Amino acid sequence: VSKPGYVANPLFTNLFPATSGNAVNGLGETEIRRPSPFFWHPVNMHEFGALQTEVINYHRRSPEISAEYSPTRPRGPKPIEKAAIPVDKAPSEWAEAVKSFALEHEGDLVGIAATDPLYVYDGYEIPHPWLIMIGVTMDYDNLSQVPPSFDNPTSAVEVARQYNRASRVCRELTNFILAQGWEAEALNGPFAKSLNMIPAAIAAGLGQLGKHGQMINRTYGSSFRLSAVATNMPLIADSPDDFGSDDFCTSCQVCSTACPPGAIFDTKQMVRGVEKWYVDFDKCIPYFGEALDCGICIAKCPYSRPGAAPRLAEKMLARRARKVSEGA
């Protein structure tokens, strides 16, 4: 339920097509399918192109935000030519090597997942069998200054800075892999490409899906951004990391209460054949547009407070263990 007094800005609502964004996302669908290209994809690939363009243009009215998304900002090198002969190493060695490289080149989190067609947007293909998922953390003091505004765009600028950093990590790693003679493609945000990053990052062990529709990591909470590298370098997949945040979200209402347009469901929804946490796009995006990226749900998440995520993970796992013990 939206907060009293909140009215969606017609600058954005007037650009909604007849189709609901929730329908495009598959809300209520019971059959498993690939995600459809949507917001942040090229505007000719979906019905929300005019709205997407207006949101971007509105955000770029902020000189500080516009500067961070300028082509002059460092986002990493262009791809090099792949070495002719691939270096032969065991998958375990390569897995360790790419993780070490990413962490030594501005990355904070890294995990590996096998490519699954369900991670790939309809109409796209990822020909490589492996996905290296990368996370970069955000500065909480900056992030916590939500919602951003033209007078104080600090939190939106922080998001843009970390997207740039995530881009540098994945592009540097791409060139490292190409130099070893293996194929590699950098997949970076904020604009969408072939990969739906959150499901892949969950599979790679970077965290769990939160009630706010974003990831929660056991160390950094929701205060991080993603990029990825797709490759045919022989690797080993990591396992998903279940540290109890899903149980926590079930009883927590911090993000859903804080959300001005009331876009966050308090219960899981059926989305493309999977029951999961979901955010109402049609309610979220007008406020996201007006609030210059918003970010309230991420900043207010109890897991995002510095030092809180490890303590909450320990608490939730201990609680789960007690329940198992009591039921034995």
Q: Which residues are covered by each model-predicted region?
A:
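Iron-sulfur (Fe-S) cluster-binding modules
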Residues: 1-112, 122-127, 299, 303-328
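Catalytic cores of enzyme domains
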Residues: 92, 99, 108-322
